[in-house]
């Protein structure tokens, strides 16, 4: 019986690799500096495996919207704000960091966050995962991952 169970696990990993091996935004939920995010973004793009945005995803976590095989869970909440400097410049908007975030978003989302000033201020503005899927055309994550 244990052999059958082990075989089923292996087969499901082969048949459903995107679901069983999907990386998630969980460990990046609270944002942070680009050095923390870029290796994970590069890895996700290189592997082509599904990258799942779920739960709370703020600041640079939204960069994962630019991953080539990204999906978003309907229950996710994405929080957007302008990029900013470090140290004494932490409260100063940084055009380069802001542009990096904009470049990660598809055209519809980019137009929306720009038109509504989401990346022109340091305070968070949120968009639900359901809205990211329905209005901005991002892929919905398969259930069960």
Regions found by a protein language model. Give the residues of each.
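Sec/Tat signal peptide C-region and signal peptidase I cleavage site
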Residues: 15-22
